[in-house]
Amino acid sequence: MIIKPRVRGFICVTTHPAGCAASVREQIAYVARRGPIERGPKKVLVIGASTGYGLAARIAAAFGAGAATLGVFFERAPADAKPGTAGWYNSAAFHDEAAARGLQATSINGDAFSDEIKHKTIDAIRRDLGQVDLVVYSVAAPRRTHPKTGVTHQSTLKPIGHAVRLRGIDTDNEAIKETLLQPATPDEIADTVAVMGGEDWRMWIDALDAAGVLADGAKTTAFTYLGEQVTHDIYWNGSIGEAKKDLDRTVLALRGKLAARGGDARVSVLKAVVTQASSAIPMMPLYLSLLFKVMKARGTHEGCIEQVDGLLRDSLYGAQPHVDAEGRLRADRLELDPAVQTRVLELWDQVTDDNLYTLTDFAGYKAEFLRLFGFGIDGVDYDAPVEPNVRIPNLIE
């Protein structure tokens, strides 16, 4: 079938298998150009492995360090001529490329928050890997059903204590709009922490440790975004910020647990990129469009694979890791360059409907958004029929 993009709000409801595969190959090629990751991991579990930063981590570990990988994700398979999700096709392509290079790859499709998937993961590690020496936690989900209580918690994107008015882009109409966000209630804050805080990461590490499948010297990292002044009302001072602070508290306990056996636990702070999650946040399309404009002009623009490949080489397995005062690994230094942030702030209130395409790189933002779903990738013939029914080898469901 011929598949074209169909966008509704912040979601593209179609995906292109060949485009997703080409995107994965592009990321693999980037890692290969940079050469082997010295002293890198050899047996890696990535929780949230099918898109964005999690996929990039799996690619960097496998094709940069030669690691065997186990990926956990929650994706929809193709069915009845209806395409699957982008993460499904990304993972299928990853498996194909790994097999072609003799790299061990196993994937598990299911709810990472559940005890069932944790147990399946432990069984798979015992069978295929024995133990893992790196656990990457890269889960972005709007809700979580707690495995012990059965309660489903919904995350909320709201400020705390006062309403906040945000500038943004109505991406459907390509117009500047303002959104008034009301403050979160105590229950909404608690629910957001339950979904996006550190509890599930801790549950994973506790379960893996108790099962004896964490190697001596094992490391774990959870990915997060903090941002700067223009995004702080939402990302640090809001409901999501409370979840990020919970992550910072959680990592201290995990670090103590792993350090006893020569390991480490760190929160890794990555730069703002276009993801399905970030595109749903009212201010982020405008911020990202401005950030792209400024960073591309300076030659410092990076996407997921550049960020995570650099994180592994420079910090997780580098001799001189970039660590902030709170002990987090920082890969977002170029975004937070004062010259970059000053220029973004200067342009922030100047953007109008008329100059959207000149003051910002909204065109680049839209292109990156479509790339998430396999569209706009060089070398792909989008007028040619493509087979949507793609299977993932070594998949556990």
Swiss-Prot record:
Pathway: Lipid metabolism; fatty acid biosynthesis. GO terms for molecular function: enoyl-[acyl-carrier-protein] reductase (NADH) activity; NAD binding; trans-2-enoyl-CoA reductase (NADH) activity. NAD(+) binds at residues 48-53, 74-75, 111-112, 139-140, 244, 273-275. InterPro entries: Eno_Rdtase_FAD-bd_dom, Enoyl-CoA_Rdtase_cat_dom, FabV-like_NADH_b, Trans-2-enoyl-CoA_reductase. The active site is at 235 (proton donor). Keywords: Fatty acid biosynthesis, Fatty acid metabolism, Lipid biosynthesis, Lipid metabolism, NAD, Oxidoreductase. The record marks 75 as: Plays an important role in discriminating NADH against NADPH. It catalyses: a 2,3-saturated acyl-[ACP] + NAD(+) = a (2E)-enoyl-[ACP] + NADH + H(+). Its EC number is 1.3.1.9. Substrate binds at residue 225. Transmembrane segments: none annotated. One of its GO terms (biological process) is fatty acid biosynthetic process. It holds the Pfam family Eno-Rase_NADH_b. Belongs to the TER reductase family. Monomer. HAMAP family: FabV_reductase (MF_01838). Involved in the final reduction of the elongation cycle of fatty acid synthesis (FAS II). Catalyzes the reduction of a carbon-carbon double bond in an enoyl moiety that is covalently linked to an acyl carrier protein (ACP). NCBIfam families: EnoyACPredFabV, PRK13656.1. This is Enoyl-[acyl-carrier-protein] reductase [NADH].
